[in-house]
Amino acid sequence: MFQRWSFALCRPIVAAAQVSQQQVPPSEEPRNESGAANPPLVKEEFLRQFRERLANDKTGRNSLEGFLDLPENLPPTAASIGPLKRGKEPLPPWLKLKVPMGASRQPRFNKIRRNMREKRLATVCEEAKCPNIGECWGGGDEEGDGTATATIMVMGAHCTRGCRFCSVMTSRTPPPLDPEEPRKTADAVADMGVEYIVMTMVDRDDLADGGAAHVVRCVTAVKERNPGLLLEALVGDFHGDLKLVEMVAGSPLNVYAHNIECVERITPNVRDRRASYRQSLKVLEHVNNFTKGAMLTKSSIMLGLGEKEEEVRQTLRDLRTAGVSAVTLGQYLQPSRTRLKVSRYAHPKEFEMWEKEALDMGFLYCASGPMVRSSYRAGEYYIKNILKQRETVEAPSVSDGGNEPKDSE
């Protein structure tokens, strides 16, 4: 849309230049006393009038602000762009990212990337092609303020599930677990020098415990090596086995995150058949009950997959009823041609609306925006404050002697 608008405005300029050349032959061009040709007055006059017309335009359609500001009485959901056909609609202005800085101006970004390569660790930032990787890994490199964060993905880079929105590689028989991964992960986090880390996992349905014991070992190793670190574990549903959920919830993590991903109606078309909307709610609710509310729980919703407004509202209600404390909402972007297509681009005002509604429902924190992802670093600043406030109050122990990790089979 923005490109077509730009080209449309350029055509009159080109046409005016052609007309001016036709109307004023070289032999008849006005000349000054020295015989030199005067400036092309026709072009100057046209450009003056053109600039004046743009400056006085009141339609709101000829500027970037016009795309972002909604007319009065127009609901935010009505401003979304869609339905879409691949190749027919460019990204709207609010999804255009700034050009990344050069390597010399991103020391934090380069340090984290080099660290991951050396230790052969995977990150969901790269595997899932997250658009915020420069901002999160850079941690405010350009401004010099901010904290670099990264999402480390444990248990390899191959997932046994095939969700239709995700670009992580899928395999029925992934490589065996690396017994050295807990130590490598702890070393990598220590080298990063970060205050907040997100540890996520691929689903490993090929393992009897879904990899729960391995996750616990990774969390424990990271916390022992980095005692002051705040750690968020973004994990799967472990086949819906609540004993495995308890095992992970009883580890020394700070935030238990599990994404519901989308509204209930479209879940079968979006997520792998082994995942379900109700199973995800059951996992989140059980964590809250098992820890007696001491554990901060978090989930995420994607927009642009065919959901309706009331369905998003109901999903927020369901999450809050399950005891979820923090939620993020972001725009789904198709990572490759083999993944689900985007049904619509939600307007920034719609994300603002959902943030307000979520906070009104009682969520302690909500990050809502077109480029927000479940591990988006903007949310972690606020979550850190919540966790530090809770540290001043002695929380009941959630560990259980029966939850000692056993080897993943």
Swiss-Prot record:
Residues the record lists as binding [4Fe-4S] cluster 1: 125, 130, 136, 375
Source domain of life: Eukaryota
Predominant location: mitochondrion
Keyword annotations of the record: 4Fe-4S, Iron, Iron-sulfur, Metal-binding, Mitochondrion, S-adenosyl-L-methionine, Transferase
Necessary cofactors: [4Fe-4S] cluster
Documented EC number(s): 2.8.1.8
Cofactor, how bound (note): Binds 2 [4Fe-4S] clusters per subunit. One cluster is coordinated with 3 cysteines and an exchangeable S-adenosyl-L-methionine.
GO biological process: lipoate biosynthetic process
GO cellular component terms, semicolon-separated: kinetoplast; mitochondrion
Entries under Gene3D superfamilies matching the protein: Aldolase class I (3.20.20.70)
Residue span(s) of domain Radical SAM core: 142-364
Any one Gene Ontology molecular-function term assigned to this protein's record: 4 iron, 4 sulfur cluster binding
Reactions it catalyzes: [[Fe-S] cluster scaffold protein carrying a second [4Fe-4S](2+) cluster] + N(6)-octanoyl-L-lysyl-[protein] + 2 oxidized [2Fe-2S]-[ferredoxin] + 2 S-adenosyl-L-methionine + 4 H(+) = [[Fe-S] cluster scaffold protein] + N(6)-[(R)-dihydrolipoyl]-L-lysyl-[protein] + 4 Fe(3+) + 2 hydrogen sulfide + 2 5'-deoxyadenosine + 2 L-methionine + 2 reduced [2Fe-2S]-[ferredoxin]
SMART domains from the UniProt entry: Elp3
Region described as Disordered: 21-41
Binding site for [4Fe-4S] cluster 2: 159, 163, 166
Subcellular location: Mitochondrion
Pathway where it operates: Protein modification; protein lipoylation via endogenous pathway; protein N(6)-(lipoyl)lysine from octanoyl-[acyl-carrier-protein]: step 2/2
UniProt similarity note: Belongs to the radical SAM superfamily. Lipoyl synthase family.
Remaining remarks: This protein may be expected to contain an N-terminal transit peptide but none has been predicted.
HAMAP family (UniProt xref): Lipoyl_synth
Name by which UniProt lists this protein: Lipoyl synthase, mitochondrial
Protein's organism: Trypanosoma brucei brucei (strain 927/4 GUTat10.1)
Taxonomy of the source species: Eukaryota, Discoba, Euglenozoa, Kinetoplastea, Metakinetoplastina
